Curated annotation (Swiss-Prot):
GO BP annotations listed: nucleobase-containing small molecule interconversion; pyrimidine nucleotide metabolic process
A Pfam short name: Cytidylate_kin
Annotated source species: Bacillus licheniformis (strain ATCC 14580 / DSM 13 / JCM 2505 / CCUG 7422 / NBRC 12200 / NCIMB 9375 / NCTC 10341 / NRRL NRS-1264 / Gibson 46)
Stored HAMAP family: Cytidyl_kinase_type1 (MF_00238)
InterPro entries tied to this protein: Cytidylate_kin (IPR003136), Cytidylate_kinase_dom (IPR011994), P-loop_NTPase (IPR027417)
Similarity annotation: Belongs to the cytidylate kinase family. Type 1 subfamily.
Designated name of the protein: Cytidylate kinase
UniProt keywords, alphabetically: ATP-binding, Cytoplasm, Kinase, Nucleotide-binding, Transferase
Reaction it catalyzes: CMP + ATP = CDP + ADP; dCMP + ATP = dCDP + ADP
GO cellular component, one term: cytosol
Main localization, broad class: cytoplasm
Highest taxon of the lineage: Bacteria
Gene transcribed to yield this protein: cmk
Single GO term (MF): CMP kinase activity
Length: 226
């Protein structure tokens, strides 16, 4: 019987992590855990409730009293709920995207999120994507992938995503925002964006999503047979 693995996929904003992770999870019949959506959810909630994003204690208290649930719809789409309310679309707005790196830098927030994420992965058979999965959340994951792509390519992808959703955001603004998030994510003190020593690096700039997923699936299949 094939072993159920833990797969960690890390990388900067808009490198294609979530899209690839969903494909890999679907093909392997694994559970997909979008850690970025969890951080987005608490950022959205804080903005909705008017909590000061510079107040780590208030944000951590808000997270500890809030149930964040990730489910999969019958159509295979991930849904995000806060206390039973569907916030799947609401957490993808620019206001949340622009603030999530601020909320995610706090030790109290990351500690609570890490605990929840590790509980979700206890039995294996999971694909988890984020910034610090291979280095911090699942340091013993059997497969660790670090996705890269140029800022220009990532801004292009985000721009195309926004056009599909009907959002009107300038390409240059998106590129600048991605550079800012890269800086915040890689320079934060707690669990910064960093490639794990034993992670396999894949540059996705000139690859399609399916090509990236296929590369990862080959690695997973090889590991699962060992």
């Amino acid at each position: 019987m094939e072993k159920k693995l833990c797969i960690a996929i890390d990388g900067p904003a808009a490198a294609g992590k979530s899209t690839v992770a969903k494909i890999v999870a679907r093909k392997k019949s694994y559970i997909y855990i979008d850690t970025g959506a969890m951080y987005r959810a608490i950022t959205y909630l804080a903005l909705e409730k008017g909590v000061d994003l510079n107040d780590e204690a208030a944000l951590t208290a808000l997270l500890k009293e809030s149930a964040i649930d990730l489910t999969v719809s019958p159509e295979g789409e991930q849904k995000v709920y806060i206390a039973g309310e569907d916030v799947t679309e609401a957490i993808r707005t620019d206001s949340v995207s622009n603030q999530v790196s601020i909320v995610a830098k706090y030790a109290g927030i990351r500690e609570e999120m890490t605990k929840r994420q590790q509980q979700l992965a206890e039995k294996g058979g999971v694909v988890m994507d984020g910034r610090d999965i291979g280095t911090h959340v699942l340091p013993n994951a059997e497969v660790k992938i670090f996705l890269l792509a140029s800022v220009e390519e990532r801004a292009k992808r985000r721009f195309e995503e926004n056009v599909k959703k009907g959002y009107n955001v300038n390409y240059e603004t998106l590129a600048e925002e991605i550079r800012r998030r890269d800086k915040l994510d890689s320079e934060r003190e707690i669990s910064p964006l960093k490639k794990a020593d034993d992670a396999l690096e894949i540059d996705t700039t000139s690859l399609t999503i399916d090509e990236v997923a296929e590369k990862i699936l080959q690695i997973v299949d090889k590991k699962a047979q060992k």
